[in-house]
Amino acid sequence: MENQKQRLGRLAEDAAQAFLENQGFTIVERNYRTRVAEIDIVAKEAETLVFVEVKARGAFSRGGPREAVSLAKQQKIILGARFFLMERGLVDVRVRFDVVAVYEENNAFRIELIRNAFQTD
């Protein structure tokens, strides 16, 4: 049985997927997992493969969504993206790392897309 945080996370991912699709993204995969990382959503926007971290912020959450994706979390997502590309034999592919912030407000969601939230260096 899922707890309140898990429920909010699942609903936020569903809302984020619908939002991205409405923005013209094509969803490639959800909840991609490796031994070291999980990527919430892998999507395509035009010719760019986008790795998306979904951050749900409830009424009592502290900090913004960008701050919620720590440097360590960014590194895990980047590593997961490398595994994804390698497993599928994808080379010379344009990639981007976005964060979708899902704010729960008055039993509804407000969604913010943060493009290029972080990059590989």
Curated annotation (Swiss-Prot):
A GO term for molecular function: nucleic acid binding
Signal peptide region: none
Pfam families linked to this entry: UPF0102
InterPro entries: Restrct_endonuc-II-like, tRNA_endonuc-like_dom_sf, UPF0102_YraN-like
Organism superkingdom: Bacteria
PANTHER family according to UniProt: UPF0102 PROTEIN YRAN
Name by which UniProt lists this protein: UPF0102 protein HRM2_30940
